């Protein structure tokens, strides 16, 4: 959401990790205000929310601003 300051704070970290894991992961952003049905379908109740999807299934979810190390750990677990 455009008004979400925590989302804006998290963006540079997510972009850094997208670069580090380029070719291994696909990173996308979704504005919940513009896509409320998608947010509802994934059970998103708070933002920012990071979903980690493997083989079409959500395998991990992080809600709130997280450190680069925390997010990287979940990416590595998801890739394992």
Tell me what each language-model feature is.
Residues 9-30:
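Conserved helix-turn-beta segment immediately C-terminal to the redox Cys motif
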Residues 36-40:
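Short conserved loop adjoining the S-adenosyl-L-methionine
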Residues 4-7, 50:
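The canonical Cys-X-X-Cys-His
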């Amino acid at each position: 959401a455009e008004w979400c300051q925590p989302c804006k704070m998290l963006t540079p970290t997510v972009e850094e990790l997208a670069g580090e894991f380029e070719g291994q992961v696909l990173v996308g952003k979704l504005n919940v205000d513009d896509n409320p049905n998608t947010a509802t379908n994934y059970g998103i109740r708070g933002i920012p929310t990071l979903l980690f999807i493997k083989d079409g299934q959500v395998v991990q979810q992080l809600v709130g601003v997280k450190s680069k190390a925390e997010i990287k750990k979940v990416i590595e677990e998801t890739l394992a």
